[in-house]
């Protein structure tokens, strides 16, 4: 969220890594870690979701979660973090808009070039990515946020959505406002590798593998240089 929300420039400009925002993130992450603001559980592990409950061995160890939209629909990760329907924190969470809008992930649909069903495959892709009627039905059935601004605008204006995981709050209004502020101009083909290298370097610093901010920065730069060989890393 910090990487893709706080940066105003792409990771790579004119073939060179732009690490100007990294120092602030390293300092912030280490301070939060040292003050106990970070639970220490790794995202998507068995120890992570139970920290959202108010009972059990991992109870009350987190203030909140960063989730993708599919995780806050019925049957998603948030429901597990609440202990399921009737759980100790079921319906007690709320969704808020963060100080910056950010983006991550996505789903790729690929078609085998020698398929015998090219027409059907094309229809499927169109239906899933551009057919407003189909996307509206998906929103209504799944409670997920789709990549169609018109559909989501109509959904939020209807005001009929009520998410029991948030005690009846309409998550779509919050998500729509946040998504509308996303700046995709900073996206690059290198984001996944560079973000992962930054996370690994900062985790090592917080866990004592490296001992200073300079060491953390150098570890990050070395990792990017090894992983992304077609850019300049200085």
Feature locations, PLM:
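Beta->alpha turn/N-cap motifs
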Residues: 66-75
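Sec-exported extracytoplasmic/periplasmic mature domains
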Residues: 30-37, 113-116, 126-134, 143, ...
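Short beta-strand->loop
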Residues: 9-21, 67, 97, 112
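Glycine-centered hinge/linker elements that transmit conformational signals in sensory
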Residues: 11-46
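Conserved C-terminal helix/tail region of periplasmic/extracytoplasmic solute-binding proteins
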Residues: 34, 167, 173-234
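Short helices/loops that flank or line small-molecule/ion binding pockets
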Residues: 46-65, 200, 204-209
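Extracytoplasmic/periplasmic substrate-recognition and gating elements
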Residues: 35, 79-145, 150
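Periplasmic solute-binding protein
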Residues: 1-12, 103-111, 171-172, 193-203
